[in-house]
Regions:
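Iron-sulfur-associated redox domains of electron-transfer enzymes in respiratory
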Residues: 1-114
Length: 114
């Protein structure tokens, strides 16, 4: 399975103002480009850690997870420890930055890593 998680920095970050995150997620769902799609308010918070624990509880089903949000380097720094804790193969993780993009720009950036 291939999944898309869009992290929106609580939904109040000015860097997401030009984008309709629902249109982004629905584009990938409607066009069958991913097997599942999720909008998470803040993956770097403690409930984000819990989200990863639940999602990766069935990690053998996951071929690729794309997280669209902040800088990929920051994502690896924030999620790396939980991936290690759960024994998740980090080569299946791809981070893509979509801050300060329009809806169309975000879709293109995500398509480039899928």
């Amino acid at each position: 399975m291939k999944g898309l998680i869009v992290c929106v920095c609580q939904g109040t970050c000015p860097s997401f103002q030009k984008m309709n995150v629902f249109e982004v997620v629905n584009y990938f769902r409607r066009n069958n480009k991913v097997d599942f799609a999720v909008i998470h308010p803040q993956l770097c918070a403690s409930d984000g850690d819990n989200f990863w624990r639940v999602l990766l509880g069935k990690q053998e089903l996951i071929d690729k997870i794309v997280v669209a949000g902040c800088a990929p380097e920051m994502q690896k720094k924030m999620f790396g420890w939980v991936f290690k804790e759960l024994g998740f193969d980090e080569s299946k993780f791809v981070g893509v930055e979509i801050r300060n993009m329009t809806t169309e720009e975000a879709i293109k950036a995500i398509e480039n890593v899928l």
